[in-house]
From Swiss-Prot:
Role description: Catalyzes the conversion of 3-deoxy-D-arabino-heptulosonate 7-phosphate (DAHP) to dehydroquinate (DHQ).
Originating species: Nitrosomonas europaea (strain ATCC 19718 / CIP 103999 / KCTC 2705 / NBRC 14298)
EC numbers, comma separated: 4.2.3.4
Pfam families: DHQ_synthase, DHQS_C
Keyword Zinc in annotation: yes
Record lineage: Bacteria, Pseudomonadati, Pseudomonadota, Betaproteobacteria, Nitrosomonadales
Similarity section: Belongs to the sugar phosphate cyclases superfamily. Dehydroquinate synthase family.
Superkingdom per UniProt: Bacteria
Protein name (Swiss-Prot/TrEMBL): 3-dehydroquinate synthase
Pathway: Metabolic intermediate biosynthesis; chorismate biosynthesis; chorismate from D-erythrose 4-phosphate and phosphoenolpyruvate: step 2/7
InterPro entries, alphabetized: Dehydroquinate_synthase, DHQ_synth_AroB, DHQ_synth_fam, DHQS/DOIS_N, DHQS_C
Length: 369
């Protein structure tokens, strides 16, 4: 039996204990001993998409059927551009059609979009039903499946409508990454690099040394990167579940990145690609504020380049960037706040910056026409 590594997300504050486990390993889709304790009845809804369903849906359903768990599938279109109200209503339609009750768990089988949609549906259907994450993309495994952020996009901004709603379990089968396209693998690595930048300089060093192994999908390297990323996120979420302070660090590069996604149209840039370019913008801004050195910016740029990720944003007008960033969830009293680096391995939350410096960064960090 393959080894399993487990991480606890500690959320044991009153009035209820909402702590849960993240299990990481190869072949976990077949490990019903991990999943069944979180299925209170003999019925479950599996939410997935048209890409993942042919690969893993029947494997999961068959394993559950062997234990007399009745399932039905809700198969949604694939892509960030479908993360909206109309798709969410498809989930509600199916839940109502199948007479799902408050004890009927929703299982998210897919990437970040499926996890966000399923989690938001679980948070709101009958005012809350059980929710389990089975992430199948690297980005979802290291980031979006952990921490309880759920929601949908609005034409004016990304993730503007949603809820904090924690899963009961995260089951991460790293074997699903064998079918992940290279572009999506690289996008997930962008979020892994983020963890080293904001919280763990040694992890950043490790990534510099082992990036080729990650890109080659070496199982030991992949499992370590997933585990360390989840450890960092679990620690941060346990200390600040609702992003009142420390958790904001996880948004390094996201203020710029969300502006890129919104301006270019959801799906044109993968989330991790936008975060990569946005992180270089945040690093450039940090250097202009004399928080980090040019040498540190060069190290960051080289690691993203070595991963095959964009290090410059698309050529959008500064006005368009600023307009999109004004809708960022960290805006306070009309002022855009940025997560900035103090060094590799340390970041600071919620800083405003002088507009002239911001414009300099936007000018320097976009691709040539």
């Amino acid at each position: 039996m393959n080894a399993i590594e487990s991480i606890e997300v500690a959320l044991d504050t009153l009035p209820e204990n909402r702590s849960y486990s993240i299990h990481i390993g190869q072949g976990l889709l077949s490990r019903m001993d991990l999943l069944l304790p979180h299925l209170p009845g003999k019925k479950a809804a599996i939410v997935t998409n048209t890409t993942i369903a042919p690969l893993y849906l029947e494997k999961l359903r068959s394993a559950l059927a062997e234990h007399h768990v009745e399932t039905f599938a809700i198969t949604l279109p694939d892509g960030e551009r479908y993360k909206h109200w109309e798709t969410l209503n498809l989930i509600f339609d199916a839940l109502l059609e199948h007479r799902c009750e408050r004890r009927t768990p929703l299982i998210a089988l897919g990437g970040g979009v499926i996890g966000d949609l399923t989690g938001f549906a679980a948070a709101t259907y009958l005012r809350g039903v059980p929710f389990i994450q089975i992430p199948t993309t690297l980005l979802a495994q290291v980031d979006s499946s952990v921490g309880g952020k759920t929601g949908i996009n609005h034409p004016l901004g990304k993730n503007m409508i949603g809820a904090f709603y924690q899963p009961q379990l995260v089951l991460t089968d790293s074997a699903t990454l064998t079918t992940l396209p290279d572009r999506e693998l690289r996008a997930g690595i962008a979020e892994i690099i983020k963890y080293g930048l904001i919280y763990d300089a040694d992890f950043f060093d490790w990534l510099e040394q082992h990036m080729n192994s990650l890109l080659a999908r070496d199982p030991a390297a992949v499992n370590y990167a997933i585990r360390r990323s989840c450890e960092i996120k679990a620690e941060i979420v346990s200390l600040d579940e609702r992003e009142s302070g420390l958790r904001a660090l996880l948004n390094l590069g996201h203020t710029f990145g969300h502006a890129i996604e919104n301006a270019m149209g959801y799906g044109a840039w993968l989330h991790g690609e936008a975060v990569a370019a946005g992180t270089l913008m945040a690093a450039d801004l940090s250097r202009r504020l004399q928080r980090i050195t040019s040498q540190e910016v060069d190290r960051i740029r080289y690691l993203f380049e070595n991963t095959g990720l964009p290090v410059k944003g698309p050529r959008i007008s500064p006005e368009r960037y600023l307009e999109s960033m004004q809708l960022d969830k960290k805006v306070k009293e009309g002022a855009i706040r940025f997560i900035l680096l103090d060094s590799i391995g340390k970041a600071s939350p919620g800083d405003t910056v002088p507009t002239p410096l911001l414009l300099e960064t936007l000018s320097a960090c976009v691709a040539d026409a």
